Curated annotation (Swiss-Prot):
Activity regulation behaviour: Feedback inhibited by histidine.
Domain of life: Bacteria
Entry protein name: ATP phosphoribosyltransferase
Pathway: Amino-acid biosynthesis; L-histidine biosynthesis; L-histidine from 5-phospho-alpha-D-ribose 1-diphosphate: step 1/9
Cited function: Catalyzes the condensation of ATP and 5-phosphoribose 1-diphosphate to form N'-(5'-phosphoribosyl)-ATP (PR-ATP). Has a crucial role in the pathway because the rate of histidine biosynthesis seems to be controlled primarily by regulation of HisG enzymatic activity.
Signal sequence, renumbered to the chain: none
EC number per UniProt: 2.4.2.17
Species whose genome carries this gene: Buchnera aphidicola subsp. Schizaphis graminum (strain Sg)
Keywords assigned by UniProt, alphabetized: Amino-acid biosynthesis, ATP-binding, Cytoplasm, Glycosyltransferase, Histidine biosynthesis, Magnesium, Metal-binding, Nucleotide-binding, Transferase
């Protein structure tokens, strides 16, 4: 019998989101020994258990209340949701937050020599996909009649194998499509990884753990999106320098020893600092510009 006060998190055992999910928990300070041959791993320093499962099992485990939380791609989540709605199965969940990894899109692609004007060009096509419900929802909204060919893997080879006229599959860079003589013609669904939670009663002890975890996740993601900036700036150009940098809070201004015309400025910037911005800072007389990564951040 498992401890009902320990929070159970389902995450992908192997695949696209696995390493990033593990990295997120590690950055949140959760000490856990994750061995791929085990179904469940236990955190040493927090009452958290991690279930390592197939990604398409995660939404169902959360919706059925088997686990408390799940880290899953929105594409997998929405596909399972549509399936459960069609079958009158339990389908309730709460999205706690979108995460900053697992970014991809579900797209329609056709052989490079297939004519294409707009979405109506796919009328009566046989389309291979691992996401039949998302595909149907999209094409139904466009009043496109089509035939679905369900494949659980290697969808991109379906046209060459004579199984389909087009495919609907996940795309990150498009390199796989190009390697198989395909071109992307329409985005069906854009996806990130997300953290989801079961609905229904969650006891106080678990809520405290979940709230603590959410605070840490927010801090980790905020830190990834931010940089710590240090520079020296002319006093008479200070406002212009500050206007170039979008800070989480107002900057810290310090006097420089033996220099009444320049100050040191420290701040957390909430935007990526591009070379162009650094060059503008330099043109305003800023010097000793340092841009540092932030490991952890709590506002």
């Amino acid at each position: 019998m498992f401890n009902t006060n320990r929070v159970r998190i389902a995450m992908q055992k192997t695949g696209r989101l696995s390493s990033e999910s593990i990295k997120l928990l590690t950055c949140c300070g959760i000490k856990i020994n994750l061995k791929q041959q085990k179904l469940i791993a236990f955190a040493e320093n927090m009452p958290i258990d991690v279930m390592l499962v197939r990604d398409d099992d995660i939404p169902g485990l959360v919706m059925d209340g088997v686990v408390d939380l799940g880290i899953v791609g929105e594409n997998v989540l929405q596909e399972e949701l549509l399936h459960r709605i069609s079958q009158n199965l339990e389908n309730s969940y709460i999205t706690l937050r979108r995460l900053d990894f697992g970014i991809c899109r579900l797209s329609l692609a056709i052989p490079i020599n297939t004519p294409y004007v707009d979405i109506t060009s796919l009328k009566n096509f046989r389309i291979a996909t691992s996401y039949p419900h998302l595909l149907k929802k999209y094409l139904d909204s466009k009043n496109i009649v089509f035939k679905s060919c369900m494949l659980n893997g290697s969808v991109e080879v379906a046209p060459r194998a004579g199984l389909a006229d087009a495919i609907c599959d996940l795309v990150s860079t498009g390199a796989t499509l190009e390697a198989n003589g395909l071109r992307e013609v329409q985005v069906v669904f854009r996806s990130h990884a997300c953290l989801i939670c079961k609905t229904g009663n969650i006891n106080f002890a678990k809520k405290e753990v979940i709230n603590k975890l959410m605070t840490r996740i927010k801090g980790v993601i905020k830190a990834r999106e931010s940089k710590y900036i240090m520079l020296h700036a002319p006093v008479n150009k200070l406002e212009e320098v500050i206007s170039l940098l979008h800070g989480a809070e107002k900057p810290t201004i310090l006097k420089l020893a033996g220099d009444d015309h320049r100050v040191a400025m420290h701040m957390v910037s909430s935007e990526t600092l591009f070379w162009e911005t650094m060059e503008k800072l330099k043109s305003l007389g800023a010097s000793s510009i340092l841009v540092l990564p932030i490991e952890k951040m709590m506002e």
